[in-house]
Regions:
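Conserved short beta-strand elements that form part of the metal-binding/catalytic scaffold
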Residues: 27-62, 109-114
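Catalytic core of tubulin tyrosine ligase-like
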Residues: 22
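N-terminal beta-strand motif that seeds the catalytic metal site of vicinal oxygen chelate
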Residues: 1-19, 46-47, 62-67, 113-117
Length: 117
């Protein structure tokens, strides 16, 4: 697998404020996913994304890129062995797939994702 970037997401401390700002700024279509506190960003062509309340307590708002991997737990463990700090260990998104979030040795955050097939 080439491990492509597959998703971009805003993890925010104020979801309502972010939706209002980005919806008006880019004229994005925003679609709330019922019962999960997640908003899909529909952009037509290109990579879409989402917005949610930040899953890491106390962390500042930030955009986060997702890279597709074959095995989230194994890739997370490999990242840790190479010096990453795990912020959110492998977590299942029911009906969607699995993800984890880490910072690399320079402090940059990145997420890993494996869709449910």
């Amino acid at each position: 697998m080439a491990n492509p970037f597959v998703h971009v997401e805003l993890n925010t401390t104020d979801l309502g404020k972010a939706k209002d700002f980005y919806g008006k700024l880019f004229d994005w279509t925003l679609e709330d996913v019922p019962n999960v506190g997640y908003t899909m960003i529909k952009v037509g062509e290109g990579t879409g994304g989402g917005m949610m309340t930040h899953p890491v307590p106390g962390a500042p708002s930030a955009w986060l890129a997702y890279v597709m991997v074959d095995d989230v737990p194994a890739s997370t463990a490999k990242a840790k062995s190479l010096g990453a700090t795990i912020l959110k260990d492998t977590t299942e998104i029911p009906g969607v797939g699995w993800f984890s979030i880490f910072t690399d040795p320079t402090g940059a955050a990145l997420a890993l994702f494996k869709p449910k097939m």
